[in-house]
């Protein structure tokens, strides 16, 4: 089921939650609405579901104006962050709830619920109550309940936000596999950029009720359209052209790459910076001020005294070990990766 969001606006009092939003969601795709709290993501999700009404604009579902559609007739499954399971019902009864409202036969309900329990890998827990389940299990039950009515669209509002990191990672992979099996048009709201990158076919970046950028995860990361998008997706070094280091860094790029000198700042990712123990004409001395091990890479805060500038640098453990530093007081030398992409510059 395709969804067209046509010039949607919404205010709550004086707060502009959504400001002329236009977005097309293809049938069978999985889209992440990414942005900070209060940026309008959940408001848009509720408008699509029919839980809220826009002040302006139209939602089109499969080419039809959904303005007059009831919540039930939209055939949309909705999963909230807090699961919204019925505490006094068993897992089985929670999943069966929507089917019973549709007056489906007992045998068909039993068959479908058992099939869904197997799908979410909880086939032996149908007799338990929500309080007897872990957070990850409760979220899978909430998803099973949403899928029971065979929705054409699945809406997920921060579905993994209340779970610990390991469970979130496992559920992200599980959700992606689930989507590949059923190809239900899915919209997930998240403020977690890693979650959006792992799950979505496309990411829609929200900021203050507006869309900043729409694109595939890798395109959003490699070619951010605005400083906000660049900063939202990972660490960034923001460097002013007023600092002499700008000329040094920009001179590292091939001449064929354009430089828009009227712009006042440019942005560069920490992994685009190289550090070494060897001095040469294309690098400058620096010192490490802080080090943080983060899984399979190391985050360094370095200070380049010649330019009075602090930089964030990301290197692999092997690259760091090759430096053979005895202390942080030793000089290191900074340059750019020769095959790295041009830093993205913005007018501000």
UniProtKB/Swiss-Prot annotation:
Purpose of the protein: Part of the ABC transporter complex involved in sulfate/thiosulfate import. Responsible for energy coupling to the transport system.
Gene: cysA
Protein name stated in the entry: Sulfate/thiosulfate import ATP-binding protein CysA
Residues reported to bind ATP: 35-42
InterPro entries: AAA+_ATPase, ABC_SmlMolc_Importer, ABC_transporter-like_ATP-bd, ABC_transporter-like_CS, P-loop_NTPase, Sulph_transpt1
Chloroplast among keywords: yes
Catalytic activity: sulfate(out) + ATP + H2O = sulfate(in) + ADP + phosphate + H(+); thiosulfate(out) + ATP + H2O = thiosulfate(in) + ADP + phosphate + H(+)
Subcellular location: Plastid, Chloroplast
GO cellular component terms, A-Z: ATP-binding cassette (ABC) transporter complex; chloroplast
EC number(s) recorded for this UniProt protein: 7.3.2.3
NCBIfam families, A to Z: 3a0106s01 (TIGR00968)
Domain ABC transporter per the UniProt entry, residue ranges: 3-233
Pfam families: ABC_tran (PF00005)
Entry GO MF terms: ABC-type sulfate transporter activity; ABC-type thiosulfate transporter activity; ATP binding; ATP hydrolysis activity
Matching Gene3D superfamilies: P-loop containing nucleotide triphosphate hydrolases
């Amino acid at each position: 089921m395709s969804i067209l969001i046509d010039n949607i606006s919404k205010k709550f009092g004086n707060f502009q939650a959504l400001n002329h939003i236009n977005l097309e969601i293809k049938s069978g795709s999985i889209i992440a609405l990414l942005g900070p709290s209060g940026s309008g993501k959940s408001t848009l999700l509720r408008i699509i579901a029919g839980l809220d009404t826009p002040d302006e604009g139209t939602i089109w579902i499969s080419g039809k104006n959904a303005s007059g559609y009831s919540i039930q007739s939209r055939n949309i499954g909705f999963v909230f962050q807090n699961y919204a399971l019925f505490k006094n019902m068993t897992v089985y009864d929670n999943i069966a709830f929507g089917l019973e409202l549709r007056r489906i036969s007992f045998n068909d309900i039993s068959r479908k619920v058992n099939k869904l329990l197997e799908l979410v890998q909880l086939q032996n827990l149908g007799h338990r109550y929500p309080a007897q389940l872990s957070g990850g299990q409760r979220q899978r039950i909430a998803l099973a309940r949403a899928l029971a009515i065979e929705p054409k669209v699945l809406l997920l509002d921060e579905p993994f936000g209340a779970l610990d990191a390991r469970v979130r990672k496992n559920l992200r992979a599980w959700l992606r596999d689930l989507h590949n099996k059923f190809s239900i048009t899915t919209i997930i709201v998240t403020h977690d950029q890693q979650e959006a990158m792992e799950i979505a076919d496309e990411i829609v970046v929200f900021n203050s009720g507006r869309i900043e950028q729409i694109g595939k995860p890798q395109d959003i990361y490699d070619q951010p359209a605005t400083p906000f998008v660049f900063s939202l997706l990972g660490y960034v070094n923001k460097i002013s052209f007023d600092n002499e280091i700008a000329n040094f860094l920009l001179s590292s790029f091939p001449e064929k790459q354009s430089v828009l000198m009227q712009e006042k700042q440019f942005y560069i990712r920490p992994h685009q910076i190289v550090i070494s123990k060897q001095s040469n004409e294309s690098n400058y001395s620096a010192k490490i001020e802080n080090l943080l091990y983060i899984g399979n890479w190391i985050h360094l805060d370095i200070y380049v005294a010649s330019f009075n500038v602090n930089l964030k640098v990301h290197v692999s453990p092997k690259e760091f070990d090759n430096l053979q530093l005895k202390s942080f007081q030793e000089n290191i030398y900074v340059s750019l990766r020769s095959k790295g992409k041009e830093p993205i510059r913005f007018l501000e």
